[in-house]
């Protein structure tokens, strides 16, 4: 039996999914060191003051500007009718 090409069903919408990437927080490493210091030396330990100040400085630092959103899905929706040979939307 000859191999037939695989035919995919028609799509209602063309869409490109963005990768779900969590933003990395630069203060997580400092926070883990503060928690480790508290766990080993006690909560009110004076030896953890430098690490606590580093955490405060990190948390008070301004956040970086957000990246602009990708517009590929917008443009695909605009050109969908042309790409699907003018078939009507259902």
UniProtKB/Swiss-Prot annotation:
Signal peptide: none
Protein keywords: Disulfide bond, Mitochondrion, Ribonucleoprotein, Ribosomal protein
Subcellular location: Mitochondrion
Mitochondrion listed as a keyword: yes
Chief localization: mitochondrion
GO BP field: mitochondrial translation
Family matches, as InterPro entries: Ribosomal_mS37_fun (IPR017264)
Role: Component of the mitochondrial ribosome (mitoribosome), a dedicated translation machinery responsible for the synthesis of mitochondrial genome-encoded proteins, including at least some of the essential transmembrane subunits of the mitochondrial respiratory chain. The mitoribosomes are attached to the mitochondrial inner membrane and translation products are cotranslationally integrated into the membrane.
Family: Belongs to the mitochondrion-specific ribosomal protein mS37 family.
This protein's name: Small ribosomal subunit protein mS37
Species: Neurospora crassa (strain ATCC 24698 / 74-OR23-1A / CBS 708.71 / DSM 1257 / FGSC 987)
